[in-house]
């Protein structure tokens, strides 16, 4: 059976600042989506990460389907109206256009979609991040799909040994989407050359070279390229298929336990570690530490199993404690050096404007 998974995410308002959506907003979004299960949709699941609401939709309409995207737009718009009625902060923040134009690409919400023929057992993960950048998944996915130090299946499984093809997007290209495809392990150094710069380059998708099957897809939208100004971080979502011809689910744990430094945090202008958290966790009041959650599902004839929260077991409490130490050390450095993003990546323009004013005082 050919199935499409669509993951769509947006910040449409939150309680007391950038924390979490209200119960009423979540309920309205889920109500709109649930009305279409059994009609337009095969199944659906709604959750949040920080103040971002995430929709997981299963259907047979293919990627970029107008009806599916219109449903997500309707859910986010109606949720926004509830947020406005409640006086929530940033109501409708990620909805950058007034009207739906056929699909959600370019309208603000993050979108990751994948169409594939369902295997007899089809395990997959949904990853969702908040308070960070599109390239935040670069290192974890690189290590899981290309580094046998972290993904032992690359050595142990004949299905994985031929490696994976990485499709990488140049986020600096604003006129059109610009991609390059590189094969691991042969082009490993070239892949690393690009992915090290998570501000400019981001993984868009990953493919099995032996089977030609898509393994992963990641959203790559930059909100400021749409709005022309800072309107929030470009936190990614991803769909990752696991097991058999792909890395095992548990091989994705150690790569996220690294908690790499990424762009984001308060005002989207700092480097901080990416903390693995449970789904439905509010954004941290400790400078909005960048966060990622992961839910694993099994899929059968387009129907979703109940999810398992990948970052909820006791091991992750120890990981989070170390992430907090990394975050505290970086924040102790305040505005100085690598603690704050370079000028071209700062989401707020205050420093650039101040520098222009100061230029007149130089002699």
Swiss-Prot record:
Cofactor: Mg(2+)
Biological process per Gene Ontology, one example term: gluconeogenesis
Active site: 11 (proton acceptor), 230 (proton donor/acceptor), 233 (schiff-base intermediate with dhap)
Metabolic or biological pathway, per its Swiss-Prot or TrEMBL entry: Carbohydrate biosynthesis; gluconeogenesis
Binding site for Mg(2+) 3: 233-235
Presence of the UniProt keyword Hydrolase in the record: yes
EC number(s) stated in the UniProt entry for this protein: 3.1.3.11, 4.1.2.13
Ligand binding (Mg(2+) 1): 11, 18, 51, 93
Residues where dihydroxyacetone phosphate binds: 18, 131, 267
Residues where beta-D-fructose 1,6-bisphosphate binds: 18, 89, 102-103, 131, 243-244, 267, 348
Known function: Catalyzes two subsequent steps in gluconeogenesis: the aldol condensation of dihydroxyacetone phosphate (DHAP) and glyceraldehyde-3-phosphate (GA3P) to fructose-1,6-bisphosphate (FBP), and the dephosphorylation of FBP to fructose-6-phosphate (F6P).
Family named by the database record: Belongs to the FBP aldolase/phosphatase family.
HAMAP family, sorted: FBP_aldolase_phosphatase
PANTHER family xref list: FRUCTOSE-1,6-BISPHOSPHATE ALDOLASE/PHOSPHATASE, FRUCTOSE-1,6-BISPHOSPHATE ALDOLASE_PHOSPHATASE
Assembly and interaction partners: Homooctamer; dimer of tetramers.
Domain notes: Consists of a single catalytic domain, but remodels its active-site architecture via a large structural change to exhibit dual activities.
Protein name, entry field: Fructose-1,6-bisphosphate aldolase/phosphatase
Species of provenance: Thermus thermophilus (strain ATCC BAA-163 / DSM 7039 / HB27)
Name of the gene: fbp
